[in-house]
Amino acid sequence: MTDKVNMAEIIERLEQLEAHNAIRNCLNRYMEICDELNANTDLDELMNLFDQDCIWEGIGEKYAKSFGRYDSWQSIYDMFKSYTQNESHFVMNAHFVNSEQIYVNQNDANASWLMLQTSTFKDGRSHLNTAKLNVKFQKQADGTWKIKHFQTQNIFSRPVSHWHSEAELPLPSQE
């Protein structure tokens, strides 16, 4: 018995896998850069993750009020620039994303993640946030995938006392 190989179908499946991987890498690089926002951050690298015709917005009651909406590449750049002053807004910032869903349709894609963000600010306060991310991506002429429309919606947000403790880790007895 001989199986007929449909090369067009195999190529389409391979392109889907490559698109998923590129989209995932784009969002993860975005988070890595946001974890280290300070006066030395290369905003050009961050903004290279965005399509030239892009939108970044907070949605829902809390994040629409806190973040607002930025309707151009330059306005998004300026928003991130405000986080990169000499005295950084964040002393510690770590983003964790999970529950990923990516749907690719040829040259565009819709994706979503749950995001957990742990932060300590320059004033010493610490915060725990969880948000739903809905992100549209656009395939570029060179084949790369970039953020077209980034939306973040708060699920919960709360202050915490601190993140790091010198207390010993509780471990099971080795006896």
Model regions and ranges:
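Short, low-complexity N-terminal intrinsically disordered segments enriched in polar/charged residues
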Residues: 1-36, 40-49
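A beta-strand edge to alpha-helix "cap/lid" segment located at domain peripheries
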Residues: 2-11, 88-175
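A structural signal for alpha-helical segments
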Residues: 18, 41, 68-71, 125
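Short beta-strand segments enriched in hydrophobic/aromatic residues
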Residues: 34, 50-51, 58, 115-117, ...
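A solvent-exposed, acidic/Ser-Thr-rich amphipathic alpha-helical stretch
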Residues: 43-110
